[in-house]
Amino acid sequence: MGFLNKLFDDNAREVKKYQKKIAAINDLEPEIKALSDEQLRAKTDEFKQRLENGESLDSLLPEAFAVVREASWRVNGQRHYDVQLIGGMVLHDGRIAEMRTGEGKTLVATLPSYLNALTGRGVHIVTVNDYLARRDSEMMGRIHQFLGLSVGLIVHGLNYAQRRESYAADITYGTNNEFGFDYLRDNMVTRPDGLVQRELHYAIVDEVDSILIDEARTPLIISGEADKPTELYNRIAMIIPRLKPEEDYNVNEKDRVVTLTEQGVSRVETMLSVENLFDDLHTELAHHVNQGLKAHALFKLDRDYVVKDGQVIIVDEFTGRLMFGRRYSEGLHQAIEAKEKVKIEKESQTLATITFQNYFRMFEKLAGMTGTAMTEEPEFKKIYKLDVVEIPTNMPMIREDLPDVVYRTEEGKFKAVVEEIIERHKKGQPVLVGTVSVEKSERLSSMLERRGIPHQVLNAKFHEKEAEIIAGAGLKGMVTIATNMAGRGTDIILGEEVAPLGGLHIIGTERHESRRIDNQLRGRAGRQGDPGSSQFFLSLEDDLMRLFGADNITGMMDKLGMDDSVPITSKMISRSVETAQRRVENRNFEIRKHVLDYDDVMNLQREVIYAQRRQVLMGGNIQESIADMLEKVVRETVDMFGAQSPYPEEWDLNSFLEYVENVFLPNHDITAEQVGSMEKEEIVEMLLERAQAHYKTRETAFGEEIMREIERAVMLQVVDKKWMDHLDAMDMLREGIGLRAYGQKNPLVEYRREAYDMFQGMISSIQEDTIRYIMRVTPQVTEQKPEEPQHVRTNRDEEQPARPVHNEGPQIGRNDPCPCGSGKKYKKCCGADS
């Protein structure tokens, strides 16, 4: 308890600090109120001028906040409460503001976004879906536009020109997916005029827990079609149903793993007519079997995905929303398509990928807001260096949170939920019921239909009406069934006569793995001092209770001889449930941390490649880079053949000269006798001199301008192809690295070491291929058209080998971070030997 007391003391102290500035803002109110619309708008230019003259944003804050507050009142009829001003200051300081549902987070964001947009460097306001981004940009954008700032919107379906214009605005509203994908696309363009994003200056993330924690494990992936047949998926889908659970395979639901038993392996081998499923010849077949098993045993229709218009659409486990465009990777999505007998889409190859963790950590300043962040504060601090400040509510919270009730079976629980709904419906009290899946919401809906209770259902199948359904959930007599946190971001306003009936009543039908998600459901009631209540109905058959320790409760119920219809409520049960949730939360945090440890390795490599690619794209000194590459390739070629013997006459000179011709000196007239009579360093000098002369001849023939254009196009094309292959190779490395633990080796250390070697190999391969093409390519004169996006899709998938290593390493500064991911400087780590 001492820790909790300290936590609340610290929070109160932080809030008190901000409250001192509130007085200054409030004191300015009469003066600002007296300004005309034109004078109020002119304040924006005045602030910009004062910034140029050396004033800081912090010193402008009281006046800027007072201006936004007044503009909001004039434009939208909304005046920021004092607690909302505190929220705005917390966001300006690059922290997370925890504000209860209904406290007006969207309005809060207008304060720091206006202040930080005065720098002219852009502000991103990030929301979880297109509807909220569009709504907020329209409603809150009016305030900014009134004050002379431009507002942009980034949602699905915009063309290149619209995106570029939106990013150029002072304040840009959009979704996390669109911002992330645009960043990846920007690192795939081949001309500078194809770029849409500006620098990553300041981001305010709404529902920050959903984006930075719940979605942290899901990378954003842009992929293109891979040339792989799909027949094998159907073949596997036909044999999996013939296998018997426990006899042929074991399912570990807790870790989401399925494994074949020995009997299962031999049955699969018989059905597929192969001798050994796990030998090197059948690696791909074994992978298909594994994915087929997962598709049938772990992934359930109407829980993990739905089938809509002949397509398998993933359901977001946290919000219950359909995730259009997202696909499971590594052939799993195709395995599910085969299971559901719908058209199997071709597999894809990853072109670019990044996690939300690494995308948002690139912003110079990051802030967030949510109704529930305190339970995850350690993770926000450790991974994003973000503090959480709990903002006091404007009105006291009077919602009544009733103790959980637990039933032995799920059937008993749902019957009790229906009776509770009927009881409250009789007196006209609105009820919002939260379920964990589409399947459970439909089950409850049919039970209510049988009892003649009118109700509305909001799940992944009815997402189009989400905001409309949620907004009406507070009307008298309304019964709404919603999956998880669907409708988050839309306020539930109580209808007339509802407050005396007790306000909105929330029923949770299952505890989520995370206490935070449960708190979000409870938080739908009791907004802005409204009355309300909440209660969770649980059963021992719920996933959380079944998988994470309800044995002691089951034993107790057995001893008491309790039947299905009798609930049990006790503090011990509530404690057991909370202990199980803490256990799962810690486990999930470790998984996310583990993912990040591996992704950090890839992230450093991505930063090196993207930085060098951007340099080439923007017309950096390409000629100098080519000259360096040429020398490296010549030296590496001589070193590679020279490894056989220090004496050139003992080398395989015919192969050597063939390689030289193939890579950097086409149509040369050098003979084996010439090379055999020279010293190693003389060979390097002679080859380099001739290669440079050949390069110069080509440059003179084409002209410098065309030569630079050729070099730029070749380098970008080669880098993109090699990076794409490298991503696949890294995926394969990652997939198999866990097995190193059996050899008493640390998989992460091994991954870093091998990833670094592969990165070195890729850089060497980029240099060699770039030189090969530049020494051969003939320019074709074509009309230049505006850059159009490539035919790619955004989601996720897989496979390709890496090139062996023989080079001096990438062009990394000695003081740069080492791409192996150790966190040390290059000169102190992998560069120590060079």
From Swiss-Prot:
Binding locations of ATP: 84, 102-106, 491
A Pfam family of this chain: SecA_SW
Chief subcellular location: membrane
PANTHER family for the chain: CHLOROPLAST PROTEIN-TRANSPORTING ATPASE, SECA INNER MEMBRANE COMPONENT OF SEC PROTEIN SECRETION SYSTEM
SUPFAM superfamilies: Helical scaffold and wing domains of SecA, P-loop containing nucleoside triphosphate hydrolases, Pre-protein crosslinking domain of SecA
Annotated GO biological process: intracellular protein transmembrane transport; protein import; protein targeting; protein transport by the Sec complex
KW Metal-binding (keyword) present: yes
Family indicated by similarity: Belongs to the SecA family.
Enzyme Commission code(s) on record: 7.4.2.8
HAMAP family found in the cross-reference section: SecA
Localization, UniProt: Cell membrane; Cytoplasm
Gene Ontology MF annotations: ATP binding; metal ion binding; protein-exporting ATPase activity
Chain positions recorded as Zn(2+) binding sites: 818, 820, 829-830
Known partners and oligomeric status: Monomer and homodimer. Part of the essential Sec protein translocation apparatus which comprises SecA, SecYEG and auxiliary proteins SecDF. Other proteins may also be involved.
Species this protein is from: Desulfitobacterium hafniense (strain Y51)
Protein name per UniProt: Protein translocase subunit SecA
Catalyses which reaction(s): ATP + H2O + cellular proteinSide 1 = ADP + phosphate + cellular proteinSide 2
Cofactor: binding comment: May bind 1 zinc ion per subunit.
Compositional bias (Basic and acidic residues): 784-801
GO cellular component assignments: cell envelope Sec protein transport complex; cytosol; plasma membrane
Gene label: secA
Enzyme class: translocase
Cofactor annotation: Zn(2+)
Keywords noted in UniProt: ATP-binding, Cell membrane, Cytoplasm, Membrane, Metal-binding, Nucleotide-binding, Protein transport, Translocase, Translocation, Transport, Zinc
Chain residue ranges for the region called Disordered: 780-834
Membrane topology annotation: Peripheral membrane protein
Low complexity: compositionally biased ranges: 818-834
Function summary: Part of the Sec protein translocase complex. Interacts with the SecYEG preprotein conducting channel. Has a central role in coupling the hydrolysis of ATP to the transfer of proteins into and across the cell membrane, serving as an ATP-driven molecular motor driving the stepwise translocation of polypeptide chains across the membrane.
